[in-house]
């Protein structure tokens, strides 16, 4: 069996971890922190985010005042704030639009795109390896 055939078989029958190159999976990550982060973010995106527990998440969008989509994103709640997972190309515009609405709020936005790598665990045994029921 060739190396490629063995990798395909392992993925099909068990699980395999893939490193996702930036060019293959261009995702961006924005960190939202501060004592007002939950309330502020809840008013900025289309889904209810303030009720999210750490480790939870939801799909949402950032809209213009006229209702046009600026970016679609996944909001991931953390103990100390939120992560906004979106397309890498959307991050500069997302940051620019969000920053204009931080007036007297204790909110800090940080582009964390370059700080993390992306991996994908694939195969029928993936969830059991992660301890997910």
Which residues does each PLM region occupy?
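Basic, glycine/lysine-rich polyanion-binding surfaces/domains
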Residues: 1-133
């Amino acid at each position: 069996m060739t190396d490629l055939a063995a990798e395909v078989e392992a993925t099909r029958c068990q699980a395999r971890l893939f490193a996702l190159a930036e060019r293959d999976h261009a995702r961006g990550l924005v960190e939202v922190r501060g004592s007002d982060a939950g309330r502020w973010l809840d008013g900025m995106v289309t889904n209810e985010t303030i009720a999210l527990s750490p480790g939870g998440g939801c799909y949402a969008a950032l809209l213009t005042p006229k209702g046009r989509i600026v970016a679609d994103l996944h909001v991931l709640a953390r103990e100390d704030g939120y992560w906004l997972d979106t397309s890498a190309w959307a991050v500069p515009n997302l940051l620019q639009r969000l920053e204009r609405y931080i007036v007297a709020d204790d909110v800090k936005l940080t582009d964390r795109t370059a700080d993390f790598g992306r991996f994908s665990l694939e195969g029928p045994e993936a969830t059991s390896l992660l301890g997910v029921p």
